[in-house]
Amino acid sequence: TFLTPEENNHVTSLWGKVNVEKVGGEALGRLLVVYPWTQRFFESFGDLSSPDAIMGNPKVKAHGKKVLTAFSEGLHHLDNLKGTFAQLSELHCDKLHVDPQNFKLLGNVLVIVLAHHFGNDFSPQTQAAFQKVVTGVANALAHKYH
């Protein structure tokens, strides 16, 4: 794994407290609000007309949970992120044509949401460890683009 044992401990101890549904929905919602061009991939999700509409949209929340569930699975396979995310990379690259930069943006938004939810428990060391993880996941998801 690319994390030190200490970094891995920071990630796993915090992740055990994460509400995947709540954090996932908020992270995806914030991505769509902060980076509005990402909305074009979610036109079938209904009302994305305002920040309130996006944050309250049940399809955004459901897909956010799905995204974070996959991310959670990746945390169990940090030594093989490319393999773990190969099918999702293929789907997002070949079928959905998602700009791989969006994976990095979502990772950064996830770090912000975790900091927001956990406050003082989200130490600089924890942030650094999570930043490594979201970068690794983003790179794995972008793998099929190379």
UniProtKB/Swiss-Prot annotation:
CDD domains: Hb-beta-like. The modification Phosphoserine is found at S44. SUPFAM superfamilies: Globin-like. Heme b binds at H63, H92. InterPro entries: Globin, Globin-like_sf, Globin/Proto, Hemoglobin_b, Hemoglobin_oxygen_transport. GO terms for biological process: hydrogen peroxide catabolic process. GO terms for molecular function: haptoglobin binding; heme binding; hemoglobin alpha binding; metal ion binding; organic acid binding; oxygen binding; oxygen carrier activity; peroxidase activity. Keywords: Acetylation, Heme, Iron, Metal-binding, Oxygen transport, Phosphoprotein, S-nitrosylation, Transport. The modification N6-acetyllysine is found at K59, K82, K144. Red blood cells. GO terms for cellular component: blood microparticle; haptoglobin-hemoglobin complex; hemoglobin complex. Transmembrane segments: none annotated. Gene3D superfamilies: Globins. Belongs to the globin family. Heterotetramer of two alpha chains and two beta chains. This is Hemoglobin subunit beta. It comes from Varecia variegata. The gene is HBB.
